[in-house]
């Protein structure tokens, strides 16, 4: 997705950026609801909190980027930074977090988490907005999209309960 976004121009670049935002937010909502609680226990608070911090930094960058013209040099620079941050975050998950979770959880539990993760990604909105507040009360005040995001989180939590 990053390579396609780098090469795109005009309206197509804006559309691809919106798709990237949607995919990143769906991914992070799913991780936030399913992986992080388990990770804090299995991998430790420091590792889980480092991943949360990385996600927060990427979210901040997305908020900055949404205010910019996608054709601007500043947008392109921030896009390159975002790509580096996302790649570094994924590598940290793969090398520091996932192996510790996998070592402490049963195969059945890991499969359950995988199913819940996929359900979460399907339930999450396809047009997320990175500047949406991150609390349920603020989400309700922020508008319909935010309420949908809360409903997606609730659906994920319900799915987790029904698969446990």
Regions from the PLM with identified roles:
Residues 1-164:
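Small-residue-biased structural context
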């Amino acid at each position: 997705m990053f390579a396609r976004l780098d090469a795109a121009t005009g309206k197509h670049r804006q559309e691809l950026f919106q798709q990237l935002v949607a995919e990143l937010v769906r991914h992070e909502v799913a991780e936030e609801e399913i992986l992080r609680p388990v990770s804090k226990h299995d991998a430790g608070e420091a590792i889980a909190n480092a991943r949360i911090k990385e996600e927060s930094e990427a979210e901040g960058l997305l908020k900055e980027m949404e205010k910019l013209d996608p054709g601007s040099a500043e947008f392109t620079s921030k896009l390159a930074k975002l790509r580096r941050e996302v790649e570094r975050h994924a590598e940290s998950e793969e090398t520091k977090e996932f192996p510790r979770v996998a070592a402490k959880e049963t195969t059945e539990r890991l499969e359950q988490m995988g199913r819940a993760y996929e359900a979460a990604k399907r339930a999450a909105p396809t047009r997320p907005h990175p500047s949406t507040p991150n609390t349920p009360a603020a989400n309700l005040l922020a508008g319909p999209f935010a309420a949908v995001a809360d409903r997606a989180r609730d659906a994920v939590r319900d799915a987790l309960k029904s698969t446990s």
